[in-house]
């Protein structure tokens, strides 16, 4: 037997201070661990209720699908009268250069919205409004109310709309960028994630209506009745997110200034670059490359002179030998394996 300094009694499970544990998990935002470690005692439930993921909220939606010019006129009137509206596009591709517009969704009030199908194509598909009809009514209304427009990732929607005759050269807000400004360290700012995080709402997923992997179909092939609920929800949730995020930004003037003066103007710049590319002066680029090469060569010569010998600057092993063994520089930090870092 080997004495390892541990006895059997010390390995017994002790009582957990669930309230302290829940408090710690809440502070550190360890939601999965909170669920795994919770004993679900009444006290534990109360202490960690903010960490428990509730059943997703279901809205009493009032969505409509527009097939008539009268419907377009009614919604054009709504855009004129509202303070802010959400807009979203549905396409048959994620490539803004080649994607075709399949439909437009709008929302002027929470728990309501409309979908305007334009490019659905499947057997038995009902007659849709033409692009020209939509532009004549809704397109013009969108343009004259553009400064009320809110979207989620408008860098995608703006070029899609532009290629189909609707110019959105100004807008009110982008919820994806609002989320980024509020929480720049978050890894995801997509609508589905934001809806769950800020609204506790589980959205309809694209895979739910169009399939996944090899069985996935184009949005243009999705039946309009099914597509409409998905698309209108996108606009509705975007409007809800805007209202929530706008409230969170009310006491953050610096972030709002950054949004309006940098992030929002940059949307148009990046959109144009993606559509048109960027011009590069080949001669200037070669000249700059030559300057950098000369500078690198000069710095390399200096490094050899200081070390007293030539070595491979790209080799971490040789760098360690030169810096810490030959030049005796102090080791300020080490790697987990004990090597100078």
Q: How would you label these PLM feature ranges?
A:
Residues 132-135, 175, 188-192, 232-235:
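Amphipathic alpha-helical transducer elements in NTP-driven molecular machines
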Residues 86, 146-154:
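Acidic beta-strand-to-loop metal/phosphate-binding motif
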Residues 88, 134-138, 173:
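Catalytic cores of nucleotide-enabled group-transfer and carboxylate-activating enzymes in metabolic
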Residues 167-184, 191, 198:
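Conserved beta-strand -> loop -> alpha-helix junction used to position metal-binding or nucleic-acid-contacting
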Residues 157-165:
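Short Gly/Thr/Asp-enriched flexible loops that form oxyanion-binding sites at enzyme active sites
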Residues 130-146:
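Short, basic/hydrophobic alpha-helical segments
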Residues 155-158, 177, 186, 318:
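Conserved nucleotide-binding/hydrolysis micro-motifs of P-loop NTPases
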Residues 1-122, 143, 186, 194, ...:
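Conserved "right-hand" nucleotidyltransferase catalytic core of DNA-directed polymerases
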């Amino acid at each position: 037997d080997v004495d390892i300094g541990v006895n059997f009694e010390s390995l017994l499970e002790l009582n957990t201070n669930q309230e302290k544990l829940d408090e710690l998990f809440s502070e550190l935002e360890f939601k999965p661990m909170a669920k795994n470690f919770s004993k679900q005692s009444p006290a534990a439930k109360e202490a960690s209720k903010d960490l428990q993921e509730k059943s997703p909220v279901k809205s009493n939606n009032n969505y409509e699908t527009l097939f008539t010019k009268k419907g377009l006129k009614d919604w054009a009137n709504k855009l004129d009268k509202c303070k802010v509206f959400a807009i979203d596009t549905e396409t048959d591709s994620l490539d803004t250069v080649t994607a075709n517009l399949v439909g437009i969704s709008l929302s002027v009030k929470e728990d309501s919205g409309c979908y305007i199908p334009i490019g659905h194509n499947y057997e038995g598909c009902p007659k849709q409004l033409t692009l020209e009809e939509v532009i004549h009514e809704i397109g013009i209304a969108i343009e004259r109310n553009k400064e009320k427009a809110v979207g989620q990732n408008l860098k995608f929607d703006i070029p899609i709309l532009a290629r189909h005759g609707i110019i959105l050269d100004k807008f009110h807000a982008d919820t994806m960028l609002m989320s980024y400004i509020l929480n720049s360290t978050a890894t995801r700012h997509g609508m589905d994630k934001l809806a769950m995080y800020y609204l506790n709402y589980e959205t309809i997923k694209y895979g739910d209506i169009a399939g996944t992997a090899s069985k996935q179909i184009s949005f243009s092939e999705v039946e309009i009745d099914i597509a409409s609920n998905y698309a209108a929800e996108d606009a509705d949730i975007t409007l809800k997110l805007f209202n929530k995020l706008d409230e969170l930004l009310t006491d953050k003037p610096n972030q709002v200034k950054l949004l309006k003066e940098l992030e929002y103007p940059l949307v148009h710049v990046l959109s144009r670059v993606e559509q048109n590319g960027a011009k590069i002066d080949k001669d200037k680029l070669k000249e700059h490359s030559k300057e950098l090469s000369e500078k690198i060569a000069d710095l390399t010569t200096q490094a050899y002179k200081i070390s007293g010998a030539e070595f491979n600057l790209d080799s971490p092993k040789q760098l360690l030998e030169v810096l810490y063994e030959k030049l005796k520089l102090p080791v300020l930090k080490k790697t987990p394996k004990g090597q100078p870092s």
